Curated annotation (Swiss-Prot):
GO molecular function per UniProt: ATP binding; CDP-diacylglycerol-glycerol-3-phosphate 3-phosphatidyltransferase activity
Protein's recorded name: CDP-diacylglycerol--glycerol-3-phosphate 3-phosphatidyltransferase
Family: Belongs to the CDP-alcohol phosphatidyltransferase class-II family.
Upper taxonomic lineage: Eukaryota, Fungi, Dikarya, Ascomycota, Saccharomycotina
Residues annotated for ATP binding in this entry: 91-98
Amino acid sequence: MTTRLLQLTRPHYRLLSLPLQKPFNIKRQMSAANPSPFGNYLNTITKSLQQNLQTCFHFQAKEIDIIESPSQFYDLLKTKILNSQNRIFIASLYLGKSETELVDCISQALTKNPKLKVSFLLDGLRGTRELPSACSATLLSSLVAKYGSERVDCRLYKTPAYHGWKKVLVPKRFNEGLGLQHMKIYGFDNEVILSGANLSNDYFTNRQDRYYLFKSRNFSNYYFKLHQLISSFSYQIIKPMVDGSINIIWPDSNPTVEPTKNKRLFLREASQLLDGFLKSSKQSLPITAVGQFSTLVYPISQFTPLFPKYNDKSTEKRTILSLLSTITSNAISWTFTAGYFNILPDIKAKLLATPVAEANVITASPFANGFYQSKGVSSNLPGAYLYLSKKFLQDVCRYRQDHAITLREWQRGVVNKPNGWSYHAKGIWLSARDKNDANNWKPFITVIGSSNYTRRAYSLDLESNALIITRDEELRKKMKAELDNLLQYTKPVTLEDFQSDPERHVGTGVKIATSILGKKL
């Protein structure tokens, strides 16, 4: 193990030996002279974050953009790819097997710029499910065959739970239930997009998600280092022996043993490297001209499958719970959304306990669920999430919050029908009343990224998000416009709707299966 840890001199591990910088006083930066409930809350939350999560990046006005639609996201991806000079680094669950246009765009960029290097990180189970037919891995293999693994480094993460009898007996269609690489990071030189969207046609056309573009070299470097670290725990696609085939190996350069050979040792080595990354990054960057930075961004991630069971150093879950615990006044409103609504019980309890006057939960209508009218077992998933929505409403009543908390279903046509959309957005917004309009709530905090805030997100998958806290009025307007864009396709749902609408009836079998398999949803 000592020998492996000494290998940190390799380029993508040098981050672990960066000199620590003097912490920056976040409270001083964000404090306002005005002792309003909003100002007081900002002081409280920034103090809490400073104590518990000091990895922080500072942004000026216009350094964060919010993309509204799938088509805008796709156009931006292609533009950024073609304009990249030094690096492209992408982490996603999968690359759609028909996304030849995107692959051609990357190929064009590599041909145009000989200095450009591309790094891909996908999930190894989802990305190889269709083998030997076309899939994510075969598309990436074509790039490696053309440009070599020195310029195109394609990695496939496979959960360490995928070993032993599970590897042999669990069918391909269901092995994703063991755990996934679920991060969505799209980096181009000194910019990075954080999103919940994957790379396939529906995410580029009619599957609503969220997308934030961050323009910062330091922020981009952080996510590049994270990308490279998780890639070093993953398999690599190298040049195929025969044209049209695929060649996947565990590189000798990886700093850990292959998980299928020694799972316990793999977890020990991977967790030490992750812990080192989180500790080495746990300082604010030195900056000048404090007053010009009106926005703070905290990276938060969940790497539970790579940590020992009782020594999880992940930052997302504890940060979300801490954030919600600071809401002690009805001067703050919140909105929570997840397309797959299986909210972690701890988060649900925190939300229900907040003393809010107004709050919204947005989830997908059964007609906007990507599994609507799918084949096989997955056809029951919309019913499962419907059942979980009903249970949430029952909990709202139990907490006597039905006057304040509204469940809203998002629907835009019917998925898989002409002009029909599906819903995949996820996130949290905290809002304060507009100083010029007391009836108008405007966000000042949001969480953006890959997590659905489910039980599986905090136990089985790799997730990466960012918590944004801002006083920038222009950014707050953009955040409100983003939220309004989601809300315009929603309608409130009550327990009475479940009682009166026969289409909301969920069979006993689905209820039982949901209770048993809830951790996998």
